[in-house]
């Protein structure tokens, strides 16, 4: 109240004095008599008071007095490794990148009727760089309001399609916002009792180096999901400058004990890593999350 409003009080002030304490007591109607107020005794409202009743009701609604981790989400029916047979078989004479391989993996998982609805693809703004625009048409970009405009590429097959039932979270140039969405989906097994499988793909240089503290917080929350560091390596996107040349995100990832990190070279390796991650996190309920770096250099991939 007026004892502090507009006052330039120094941070070295450790306690309130007599007059100030009385004004504070009167403002908040704390029933402490004048002869005791200067000693600032603790005050606890009676058990039948409106304040205590309110506090107990709110605490009960939140699940109790001590923090607990709810384990009520059922395990998901993860498909067999054979679902990725097109990738396990190699690329023949065709040259592809591991980024392209990942998009094929994601597409195959989205065709599986048992887990498709649990998958949450997340991109900040680089979906076209990763070749994911085909998903715009098949599953759509989530928008609570739907599509309110005609996109400039509306005449193309893979146009920018927003939908109230869309599945992709296209977050714009906001790695922190995109990672917040990933964390929400990655912890939904506990907070909502629903297993979600978030795949957040981004330029790897803009991951742990930019939102590493949020990744640590997600690890503390026992998040489960996949982080995909695209355009990884120091030879990628050199024309856009050093800010895209990541050669050290795995060092940052290694500081988080429950972050399982891989830097695969071939599509069959990536398929096995993703399948193993799905099994560990969504069948065995292990408290881990995966970080996988992806390249955009094209190579022939063996079986």
Give the positions of each predicted feature.
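Conserved RecA-like P-loop NTPase helicase motor core
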Residues: 2-4
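Thiamine diphosphate
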Residues: 40-302
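Conserved P-loop NTPase catalytic core
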Residues: 13-45
């Amino acid at each position: 109240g007026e004892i502090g409003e507009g006052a330039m009080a120094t941070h070295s002030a450790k306690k309130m004095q007599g007059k100030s304490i009385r004004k504070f007591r009167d403002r908040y109607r704390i029933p402490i008599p004048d002869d005791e107020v200067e000693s600032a005794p603790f005050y606890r409202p009676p058990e039948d008071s409106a304040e205590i009743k309110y506090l107990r009701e709110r605490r009960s609604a939140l699940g109790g007095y001590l923090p607990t981790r709810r384990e009520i989400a059922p395990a998901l029916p993860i498909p067999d490794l054979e679902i990725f047979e097109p990738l396990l078989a190699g690329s023949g004479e065709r040259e592809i990148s591991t980024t392209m391989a990942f998009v094929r993996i994601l597409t195959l998982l989205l065709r599986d009727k048992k887990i498709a609805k649990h998958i949450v693809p997340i991109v900040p703004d680089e979906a076209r760089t990763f070749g994911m625009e085909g998903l715009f048409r098949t599953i759509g970009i989530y928008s609570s309001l739907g599509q309110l405009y005609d996109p400039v590429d509306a005449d193309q097959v893979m146009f920018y399609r927003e939908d109230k039932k869309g599945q992709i979270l296209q977050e714009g140039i906001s790695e922190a916002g995109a990672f917040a969405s990933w964390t929400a989906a990655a912890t939904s097994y506990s907070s909502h009792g629903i297993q979600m499988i978030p795949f957040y793909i981004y330029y790897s240089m803009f991951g742990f180096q930019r939102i590493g503290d949020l990744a640590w917080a997600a690890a503390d929350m026992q998040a489960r999901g996949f982080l995909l560091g695209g355009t990884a390596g120091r030879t990628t996107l050199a024309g856009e400058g050093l800010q895209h040349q990541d050669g050290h995100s795995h060092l940052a990832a290694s500081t988080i004990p429950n972050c399982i990190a891989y830097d695969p070279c071939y599509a069959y390796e990536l398929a096995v890593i993703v399948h193993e991650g799905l099994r560990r996190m969504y069948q065995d309920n292990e408290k881990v999350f995966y970080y996988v770096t992806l390249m955009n250099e094209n190579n022939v991939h063996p079986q």
